[in-house]
Amino acid sequence: MAAEIRTFTCLNDNFGYLIHDVETKATASIDAPEAGPILKALEREGWQLTDILITHHHGDHVGGVAELKQKYNCRVVAPHDKAAKIANVDLRVANGDVVKVGSLLARVLETPGHTLDHISYVFDTEKTLFAADTLFSIGCGRVFEGDYPMMWDSLLKLRALPDDFKLYCGHEYTASNVKFALTVDPDNVALQARAAEVTKLRAENKPTIPSLLGDEKRANVFLRADEPSVAARLHMKGADAAAVFGELRERKNKS
């Protein structure tokens, strides 16, 4: 089995993703921020859309679903929780479910916090994680519907995946994430290296994803809230990791 992944920009800073099964020619869009760029990418590759795998109900992730469904009659897969907020759903999934895209297998991880219905899709064979707005490169999503312990627990689920997995996230926020992270984790050598890489990529107008999950574990301060050095930097020595994470997220909200 082999998969091809295409990345492109949707809306202002959303990422659009297509994952294509070479064997069966099945193609899934991970979320559908808007139809236009997805249609162009499909046309450019000569692919037919068979599935849309939705991560959560926010409009900037489902805005193109209706038009794509009408054109391709593709299957729409969405979280079971609050599924009524998402139109045209064919299959509702929960934690541990496996979704087939041709011969490719996507494992569902419930990762609530950003929204209560948020899920991530893990393609274990392809060592690929689509984390949408739960985990960003050098950052994480805002916590709109859940709470900080819930979001921290979701990040721990993603952190538990192997280091060689590729992270594909929902938005191109990496440069601003790096800027914030350096204010709270300035001596982190891995973060410094990632900052230099991101500066170069953005100067060349290239996306900063995918990133390797192992690199994120070393450089992303939001994945390191349980490390004593991070708590000490925030003057929270001995504090619960979820509380440290919450303080990091509050500071990022204000940055």
Language-model-detected regions and their locations in the chain:
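Conserved beta-strand hairpin/beta-sheet module of binuclear metal-dependent hydrolase folds
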Residues: 2-47, 120-132
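Core dinuclear metal-dependent hydrolase active-site scaffold
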Residues: 7, 18, 98-124, 128-129, ...
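Divalent metal-coordination and catalytic microenvironments
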Residues: 19, 31, 56, 68, ...
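Active-site HxH/HxHxD metal-binding segment of metal-dependent hydrolases
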Residues: 27, 34-110, 127, 193-197
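Active-site metal-binding loops of divalent metal-dependent hydrolases
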Residues: 32-33, 57, 81-82, 114-115, ...
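A short acidic, helix-capping loop that chelates divalent metal ions and anchors anionic groups
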Residues: 84-87, 138-144, 177
